[in-house]
Each structure stands twice: as structure tokens, then as C-alpha cells.
Design a protein with these regions (language model features):
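Subset-of-secretome marker
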Residues: 6, 12-139
């Protein structure tokens, strides 16, 4: 057997450890009077790569559904939205790609406030968690 194929001959080369750049998924949840909020953070090295905010309606009115519809109609690079079900049991999801900084939520801010959703450009997970407040349970 050829030993030179199995063993690296250059013994003077410094050892470089492999850095673990695994993605970690963090979830933060909160119950509100109107429904449930879930923030799902995709994090690598404490930097958020993607955030998905989901509001699941429980006790809502037509105005809340209109807010969800307005959020769903947001067109912005780096933001994907999804609205499911009817006006009484809707689920609205907003996914933000943190590699893109051009998104703007000012046109839907009152709708976000109505559903108690917070969409921030904070890309550090620990700061994003602090920004949510103590009423959220994060795992």
C-alpha cells in the first residue's frame, strides 16, 4: 500500500481547526389577546440570516384581517409573505432575508402594530431577542 497517499508529508504546516458554522434555529413565542406570535430566527455565529414572523389568529375582527391582507400585499425585495385561511382563523407569515437591506415597512406599520408584529432590521440575535421584550418565551 502507498503510505504517501494516506499521510500528508508536509509536517511543518500548522493545524487549522474546522470552525463550526452550523445554523441554529431559535423560536420565540407570545400569546396575545388576538392570537399567537412566533418569531423563528435562522442564526449563524449570532447573526440572523433569516427571520420568519407568524401570527396565528384566535380572536380577531375584520379590521385585523384587513391588516393581515395589507401586510400580505407588501412588495419589497428580501421579504416574502403568506396569508392562509379566512378572516376568522387566518395565519399571516412574513419572512425577512437579512442579507438584503432595502426592505421598508413604513407603509404597513399601523397594520403591524394592530397585530402586535414587530419587523426589525436588527441582525444580532441577542439584540433582536431583547428588542422583542420579556413577554416572549425564547428557546
Amino acid at each position: 500500500m502507498n503510505r504517501d497517499l494516506l499521510v500528508k508529508d508536509d509536517s511543518n504546516t500548522d493545524f487549522t481547526p474546522i470552525v463550526n458554522n452550523e445554523v441554529i434555529v431559535h423560536n420565540c413565542n407570545k400569546e396575545t389577546n388576538k392570537g399567537t406570535l412566533n418569531y423563528k430566527y435562522i442564526v449563524r455565529d449570532n447573526k440572523i440570516e433569516k427571520t420568519t414572523v407568524t401570527f396565528t389568529a384566535r380572536e380577531v375582527n375584520l379590521g385585523d384581517y384587513i391588516s393581515a391582507n395589507n401586510i400580505n400585499n407588501l412588495v419589497s425585495e428580501g421579504v416574502t409573505t403568506s396569508l392562509k385561511n379566512g378572516s376568522a382563523d387566518f395565519i399571516i407569515s412574513v419572512t425577512i432575508d437579512h442579507n438584503i437591506n432595502s426592505y421598508d415597512f413604513t407603509s404597513i406599520q399601523s397594520d403591524l402594530n394592530n397585530l402586535e408584529m414587530s419587523l426589525s432590521k436588527i441582525d444580532d440575535y441577542e439584540n433582536a431577542k431583547i428588542n422583542l421584550g420579556t413577554s416572549f418565551t425564547c428557546e
